[in-house]
């Protein structure tokens, strides 16, 4: 919030007892994130900020905390709103009951489809919600040069967006080879971010401690891609803030939390990165990360520091992350600090959640933000899905449940008539990526293992990060039926059976990424999709749709598929499906 002179004068008057506070919270046990103590005291709030901690006997309104622990609002240090497949305003409705009052988001999903207009849509839609949504401008649109996306964002296109008060830096720099080569465009983006006083986020998936030197040398200071305690420690020692991730697919917290100690915890914070709406509802958001950390040996106050002041320091947000004078009155009441049971949430001094019930009056009723989605533009034919082969020994994308990484496998496959034929008994299925933005006719076809399909196909327009159409199936006919269906609906997800009949779908009319419906409706459709998937697959224990969407992301090891073909992370090049 931007303050004016009158507001500061009113706050000072409250702090020294000359005026009443708007609100005073009494009888709470305040978690001091600076000292690590639990303290007593009244919390006086004026104009959405904390005016003081101490004795404040009078106020316009008093809340009796009745012994609850008082924590700062939780901060998600790195999240892609689009992965929840709802608009920012709907996203806020899910997060606030989980104690999350601030997010730092990278809207590179919608930017890959719609460029600057997509970023502007996200910023505008978030205005109606009692949630701080800070934006890191997408650094890598597209993620690599080896695929087609909807828009390309060079430095000169990004720079004007820094004028927006909610834009605070440059998002995850994924194109590591361009950094290592000193490419002009990525370095210009980094220089612009520095000039604007912004942070620069990293994306160090698979990078060694030696590789990190390139990142640090140009000013990249954060990373959220650690999957082991060693990787987290390497990044810590290099001078980075380390975000410990727990999302839907990227579930890394249990593997990385051993890196946290009493001496170094101030350099760690939490993020979700990508989390589906159903997981946000059933598990939670950053509150779930806190719970997991506590269950795995982290002191509760330390875990709360990681979720609040550490994240604020990481992103240079000086008035967030603490219950102290001069800080924004973003406050979470906890009935139990060990289990992180939330009873009340305040945003800017206003109660937005009470005993799990949202205060809908706190959400500004604004008209839907207009957004004209780019059309889905392709003409794929059945023959385009064929995979000609001359050798039975092929590279196969080995899907790994609950991981963004894949395995570069070598398998013996079946060939009939010079073409690959999926074999259900070996779980060797066909995968295709269809370029959907410019009708280039580009279709990448490969082989994947891990989905356990017995018939049919699934397809989605959510395909990181270029968001072309991706499908996996037992037959070309079923794959085409699924592709055709989501094309007709303007984007989305579909499950079809062996006869090509649609078992369930979810329409995503906003850029093929977001629903225009409530999060409750999206949750119902996701449940329907999962039930439909179970009808055609023997696999379980992971989300097949978000997992599929990451099999197209070439900046995470080891083997991925783009509209240009099979992408090998180790060489950062397109390779043949056949093993030479």
Curated annotation (Swiss-Prot):
GO terms for molecular function: adenine deaminase activity. Belongs to the metallo-dependent hydrolases superfamily. Adenine deaminase family. GO terms for biological process: adenine catabolic process. Its EC number is 3.5.4.2. This is Adenine deaminase. It comes from the Bacteria. It comes from Listeria monocytogenes serovar 1/2a (strain ATCC BAA-679 / EGD-e). It catalyses: adenine + H2O + H(+) = hypoxanthine + NH4(+). Gene3D superfamilies: Metal-dependent hydrolases (3.20.20.140), Urease, subunit C, domain 1 (2.30.40.10). Its cofactor is Mn(2+). HAMAP family: Adenine_deamin. PANTHER family: ADENINE DEAMINASE, N-ACETYLGLUCOSAMINE-6-PHOSPHATE DEACETYLASE. NCBIfam families: ade.
């Amino acid at each position: 919030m931007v303050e004016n002179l009158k507001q500061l004068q009113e706050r000072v008057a409250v702090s020294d007892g000359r005026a009443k506070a708007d609100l005073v919270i009494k009888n709470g046990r305040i978690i001091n994130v600076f000292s690590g103590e639990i303290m007593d005291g009244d919390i006086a709030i004026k104009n959405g900020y904390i005016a003081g901690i101490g004795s404040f006997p009078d106020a316009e309104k008093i809340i009796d905390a009745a012994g609850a622990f008082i924590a700062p609002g939780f901060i998600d240090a790195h999240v892609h709103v689009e992965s929840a497949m709802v608009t920012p305003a709907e996203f806020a409705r899910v997060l606030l009951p989980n104690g999350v009052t601030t997010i730092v988001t990278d809207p590179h999903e919608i930017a890959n489809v719609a460029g600057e207009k997509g970023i502007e849509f996200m910023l505008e839609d978030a205005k109606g919600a009692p949630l701080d949504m800070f934006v890191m401008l997408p650094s890598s649109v597209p993620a690599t040069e080896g695929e087609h996306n909807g828009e390309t964002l060079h430095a000169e296109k990004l720079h004007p967006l820094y004028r927006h008060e909610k834009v605070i830096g440059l998002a995850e720099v994924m194109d590591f080879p361009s950094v290592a080569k000193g490419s002009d465009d990525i370095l210009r983006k980094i220089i612009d971010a520095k000039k604007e006083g912004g942070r620069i986020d990293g994306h160090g998936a698979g990078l060694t401690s030696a590789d990190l030197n390139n990142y640090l040398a140009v000013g990249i200071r954060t990373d959220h891609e650690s999957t082991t305690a060693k990787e987290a420690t390497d990044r810590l020692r290099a001078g980075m803030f380390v975000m410990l991730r727990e999302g839907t697919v990227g579930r890394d917290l249990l593997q990385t939390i051993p890196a946290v100690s009493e001496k170094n915890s101030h350099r760690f914070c939490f993020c979700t990165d990508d989390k589906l709406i159903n997981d946000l509802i059933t598990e939670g958001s950053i509150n779930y990360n806190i719970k997991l950390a506590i269950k795995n040996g982290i002191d509760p106050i330390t875990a709360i520091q990681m979720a609040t002041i550490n994240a604020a320091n990481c992103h240079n947000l000086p008035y967030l992350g603490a219950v102290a004078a001069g800080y924004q009155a973003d406050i979470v009441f906890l009935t139990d600090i060990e289990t992180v049971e939330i009873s009340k949430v305040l945003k800017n001094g206003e109660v937005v959640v009470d005993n799990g019930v949202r205060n809908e009056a706190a959400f500004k009723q604004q008209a839907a933000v207009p957004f004209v989605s780019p059309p889905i533009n392709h003409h794929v034919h059945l023959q385009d899905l064929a995979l000609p082969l001359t050798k039975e020994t092929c590279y196969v994308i080995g899907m790994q449940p609950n991981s963004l990484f894949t395995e570069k496998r070598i398998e013996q496959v079946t060939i009939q008539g010079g073409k690959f034929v999926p074999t259900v008994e070996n779980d060797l299925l066909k995968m295709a990526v269809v370029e959907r933005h410019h009708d280039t006719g580009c279709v990448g076809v490969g082989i994947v293992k891990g989905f356990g399909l017995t018939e049919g196909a699934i397809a989605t327009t959510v395909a990181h990060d270029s968001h072309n159409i991706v499908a996996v199936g037992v037959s070309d006919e079923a794959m085409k039926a699924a592709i055709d269906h989501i094309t007709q609906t303007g984007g989305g997800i579909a499950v079809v059976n062996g006869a090509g009949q649609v078992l369930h779908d979810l329409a995503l009319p906003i850029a093929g990424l977001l629903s225009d419906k409530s999060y409750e409706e999206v949750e119902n459709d996701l449940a329907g999709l999962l039930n439909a998937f179970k009808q055609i697959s023997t696999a379980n224990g992971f989300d097949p749709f978000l997992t599929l969407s990451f099999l197209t992301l070439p900046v995470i090891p080891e083997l991925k598929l783009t509209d240009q073909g099979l992408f090998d992370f180790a060489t950062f090049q397109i390779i043949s499906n056949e093993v030479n």
